[in-house]
């Protein structure tokens, strides 16, 4: 049945589809069937830097992706417990965004499905619960399933999580569900609270998307009485609510954190938490306030159910469905610790087996309270796909020397040697004795300018400031120079610091003051990432690509802006200082204007809410400790309505702290895939999160400030573990799903051949590159239709290719494409049609007809 389900989902008709809060409707002609380029192996990484690799050939562009491709188918580092990679987004950052998700235009309200209600209640059940026809006719099939899921939660008087990927329409699914529960008629809209015994609905969301909720209600369900509890009119809205004049109340997380005692006293019928992952920290005041809400019908909406730690999963489910995952201690001992220990690279087989059993048990439990779908399994057949490349750029010689001086500073050496015995002969550690304070350090002296005896957290108070400096050096040396906007005392401290780390190179870098020279700032010679970016962009621009360029640093955006001006590129820019009323016009202009080549975006200000589907290249200039932030930035371009293949380039400075940032991202994403999706992941790392016994290569202060200049840290880890990708658990899974071990092993072996392109990559200033998809989630829980159709017949050929060392990558890629075409041709011949005629039939056929065709074909193959 899984095979039939895969075929059914991937070959859905691409006709007119309904819109949602983030789904745009296009006509059948606009959704011209196109083929997503085949996924390549790592050894073809250079080809991925060339656009010609991604664009389908003239012949292939006439065949849809569904016709060919879909057959194949945080941290406890020190006593102060600094959680730099797990902290919640500050409300100040939220305010800086103030930009809602894209709304829908009037032209996008064409009906695309049968104008009939969606029945939710069982036959004979009274009252009859249904989604109004005016809403149901615009829903996609996966959205209807989401509405049914939420209604089942509601009917059983408990909460749950709608964990769909960003861009799958969680907002409209929620509105459709509420319209059904409150008995709204899409045409008359007469039902109201005065005639109902139900209480009101509370929606809590980031302040940046409050307007979006208002807008979506007005477009999809204007019959609801919606009010916003935010700002100066709170008292008036509260009185209106008590008078039963409000059906839906929308407020921000920050407002609810402050006004929780007032709002928690109201008998809410349903509470919706949008971006529910904000409830990941059980010690936050927001989480404590949300626990006081009386109703059991709590629904969380989030595309990132788990971001940093498995314990976040418990916190979120403890809010939506208290007790569903047991006690906190039980969850930690039964799920959290075994899953992490079983993921160690050298974990004993017994630990791996226990982790696998606990993973399956947790998955079966989560499915009762969570529905999660990805773009690939829902609307993937309507999109051209995305490829996520991680590019390790060679730092300039000056950058490397400055980085080396930085890690030799007394502050960092104090942290690295904190556990060593003190030189004075005391039995205490250095950090508890003579090296608790660092009076000779520039950074320490500034932090403790008012207290020369240090603070209670010394020396661990130095961790975060030192990490920030290392990240700035990894991006651009100008970033560590004094900022003219800072206070004079801080500028003086920064000047002393710069003088120390620049050393004898100070004149080459223009002195210790911030440069005002346009030519100096726009020059790429002292920045490894900009040198690589210059060559990559030249290739993209020449081929008509449009680029999104993200950075967390506004100062870095200033430098990149000067670089773009110097190169003569036409660009737009959006950051926290961009007025809210101008942001949508900037987005619309970029999407509509072919002359706009680059969009410079602050990741904090534009990581959420922007719809930039005209861009097909996304550059993440600086990585974040939280992997979801980088993924959200990618989704500005990779969303419904994108008609081109999206290629993402994450730029990292090789041999720097950024490699550790990325490897921790990999670790966190793997944990999320294991705990949330029940997938199998390659065991790359020896480190175990929040475990001092197994800090390995990832965790602990010593790893943060390790010198990686003489090695390729990430590359070494990948190469070390490439031969262990198919462990015993994966072998069992592969055999169960009909894919041979040799077949899978050959695929993995052919994915790692970086030596072949090293000379050309070096010319681009790139030391190493790989595709993120090749590192994360190599082991799938299910296999594609084509893999099952293949059977074991080609095993001998694959063994032969493996013995040859996969030397002819280009021939293999061509062979794969031919195999896919041949399979599709076989289906067409079985149907008695030419390929183009069969393509039209696939797009117009009902799911039942397609399913029947596949059943008949499989019977014939057998």
UniProtKB/Swiss-Prot annotation:
Biased composition (Polar residues): 782-793
Residues holding ATP: 164-171
UniProt motif (DEAH box) ranges: 274-277
InterPro entries: Helicase_ATP-bd, Helicase_C-like, P-loop_NTPase, SNF2-like_sf, SNF2/RAD54-like_C, SNF2_N, SNF2_RAD54_helicase_repair
Biased composition (Acidic residues): 85-95
Key word Nucleotide-binding present: yes
Hydrolase as UniProt keyword: yes
Enzyme class: hydrolase
Record region (Disordered): 13-43, 58-95, 782-821
Ranges of compositional bias, category Basic and acidic residues: 58-84
EC numbers on record: 3.6.4.-
Keywords: ATP-binding, Coiled coil, DNA damage, DNA repair, DNA-binding, Helicase, Hydrolase, Nucleotide-binding
Biased composition (Low complexity): 16-27
Every Helicase ATP-binding domain range: 151-323
Annotated coiled-coil segments of the chain: 274-294
Domain Helicase C-terminal: 532-685
Biological process (GO), any one: DNA repair
Homology family: Belongs to the SNF2/RAD54 helicase family.
Official protein name in the record: Switch 2
Organismal lineage: Eukaryota, Viridiplantae, Streptophyta, Embryophyta, Tracheophyta
